[in-house]
A protein has these predicted regions:
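Contiguous alpha-helical scaffold segments within structured protein domains
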Residues: 1-75
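Glycine-rich, small/acidic residue-mixed loop/short-helix segments
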Residues: 63-69, 73-129
């Protein structure tokens, strides 16, 4: 979790954005929980949202670090197209308020076939970072 938070913080600061952070704190989905950190900030130019998302995606939770090297390794070695494995989901308010989340677990339906994309790890094995 700390890798992702540090990465997002660095990317935002490199873009001149100084966010307010809260977390980490537990977020629950049924019986499952994970650590979550929220970033709040204002974009002076809403037209920058697309380029900001491009800068942030994929996060280390999806791709690894260093980003370019890890991304190239995945493309060269994974053996399938991730397509909708991850991305951003959320609300784009016409009045300017936006809530976006990194989405890691997705489903894709094509030609009567369902593909589920999921990732995870055991925190006890890898540690809590």
């Amino acid at each position: 979790q700390d890798y992702v938070v540090s990465y997002i913080r660095r990317q935002l600061l490199s873009s001149g954005i100084h966010p307010t952070e809260s977390g980490p704190y537990p977020a629950y989905a049924g019986a499952l929980s994970h650590l979550k950190t929220s970033f709040r900030f204002t974009l002076k130019d809403n037209n920058r949202l697309g380029s900001l998302l491009e800068l942030l995606h994929p996060t280390p939770a999806v791709c690894g670090l260093p980003k370019e090297e890890a991304y190239r390794f995945i493309l060269d070695n994974e053996g399938y197209d991730r397509r909708y494995y991850s991305g951003f989901i959320g609300w784009l308010d016409p009045d300017g308020k936006t809530d976006l989340y990194v989405n890691l677990r997705c489903m894709h339906i094509e030609n009567g076939q369902l593909s589920f994309y999921a990732g995870g790890r055991t925190a006890g094995f890898f540690g809590t970072e």
